[in-house]
A protein has these predicted regions:
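Charged, glycine-rich active-site and insertion segments that engage polyanionic ligands
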Residues: 1-56, 60, 64, 78, ...
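Clamp-loader machinery-focused feature within the broader ASCE/P-loop NTPase space
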Residues: 1-151, 325
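Short, structurally constrained coil/turn elements
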Residues: 88-90, 163, 183
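Loop/turn-to-beta-strand initiation segments
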Residues: 135-139, 164-170
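Conserved strand-to-helix beginnings and helix N-cap segments that scaffold or border functional pockets
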Residues: 150-154, 284
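Conserved catalytic/switch belt of AAA+ P-loop NTPases
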Residues: 154-168
Length: 375
């Protein structure tokens, strides 16, 4: 087997993990199951690994040493091209099913859907029966699999129980407990965990060199970036492509402080701007990112209050954390942090969307703790 650097080039940031070693062994022995479940936290790199698996299956020149994809042939580049990292995969034999995917009914519009319904699975059942067009196998990725409705899951189970030849399914889930036990039992599970900081940093340097992305040169900014990632390479990929996540987080903290000091009317006006028109998946995702930032900020305040300042996330904001934490009662801070996390969880499960997302945000904002008068 090749060294870990070569494995990392082929299989990505999780190559040295238990999941990565298991995956390499599957390809080396040519015993890849027809259904894989890749589980792990949001942003840990599940989609990246799924695409690497698809590359390995469709690759024109697979690595003879570690059975990985070459990453440079036509098939590999159509699934991931470092020169165009934001381009969606374009391969006739790879289907990515997600919330908002096409379905079997021409008059259905799923663009704002937060679930994967049975009509989408009906279309996938048909796609699975088709002979691969360009490659020898067909790969169907379902992301996130926990978005399957009950009816869709039941229908999909039948396909898993009798998978068509030369068709492989890869299910991705950050909440695998929401998948039925029967579906999970039909899949081989690979669990991805957050990476240690040193491994994450090594991967980040390699990925930046591959994509031509410029990383922060300031050591403090770089350290804060790695802390914000919490060991999640997928989070870094998504956020660095979109801009400067450290500056964005600073702006989100500014908003959190401003809204905490705002009047009731000002809070509701801000909620209208953020969630009043959150009727599509992208708007809901943006709201979730804001709540993630708020959760991190209020957690830092709580850590400061409980003499755990060494564990705060936003080290560059230490002075603001110290000053702000002194304005709130510790119990109130803890209670509000729980409220943020409950609101975030509701939206994550798709229970609240559209006007209901606005209502959830209203309730949250109206329960921000009252600060003490500063001396």
């Amino acid at each position: 087997m090749s060294d870990s650097t070569s494995l990392g080039d082929r299989w990505g940031p999780h190559a040295d993990s238990q999941a990565g070693r298991t995956l390499v062994a599957m390809f080396e022995t040519q015993r890849l199951p027809h259904a894989l479940l890749i589980a792990g936290p949001v942003g840990v790199g599940k989609r990246d690994l799924a695409l690497r698996i698809a590359q390995a299956m469709l690759c024109d020149s697979p690595d003879e040493v570690n059975a990985g994809p070459c990453r440079t042939c036509r098939n590999c580049l159509r699934l991931h091209n470092p020169a165009q990292p934001t381009l969606d995969p374009q391969h006739t034999d790879v289907e990515i099913v997600s919330m908002g995917s096409l379905c079997a009914e021409s008059d259905h519009d799923h663009r704002n859907s937060r679930t994967i319904g049975i009509c989408v699975i009906r279309r996938i059942e048909h796609v699975a029966t088709l002979t691969p067009f360009e490659a020898s196998e067909r790969v169907i990725i379902i992301n996130p699999a926990d978005a399957l409705t009950a009816d869709a899951a039941d229908a999909f189970l039948k396909t898993l129980e009798e998978p068509p030849e030369r068709v492989y399914f890869i299910l991705l889930s950050a909440q695998q407990e929401q998948l039925s036990e029967t579906i999970r039992s039909r899949c081989r599970t690979l669990t991805l965990a957050p990476l240690p900081v040193d491994r994450l940093e090594r991967w980040l340097d390699r990925w930046a060199a591959e994509t031509g992305l410029e990383l922060p040169s300031d050591a403090q900014q770089r350290a804060e970036l790695l802390r914000l990632a919490r060991g999640r390479p997928g989070w870094l990929q998504d956020n660095l492509r979109d801009g400067d996540p450290v500056s964005l987080r600073a702006a989100q903290i500014d908003d959190a402080i401003r809204i905490a000091n705002a009047t009731r009317a000002e809070r509701l006006e801000w909620a209208e701007q953020i969630a009043g028109r959150s009727t599509n998946a992208q708007s809901i995702d943006n709201l979730q990112l804001i709540l993630d930032a708020w959760s991190d900020w209020w957690r830092d305040l709580w850590l400061q209050q409980t003499n755990q300042a060494q564990s705060i996330l936003h080290v560059s904001q230490r002075e603001r954390i110290e000053g702000t934490a002194a304005l709130y009662d510790q119990g109130a801070t803890s209670h509000f942090l729980e409220r943020i996390q409950r609101t975030r969880a509701l939206i994550e499960r798709g229970i609240t969307h559209g006007l209901n997302a606005r209502l959830a945000l209203d309730v949250l904002l109206l329960n921000i703790p009252t600060a003490r008068e500063s001396s």
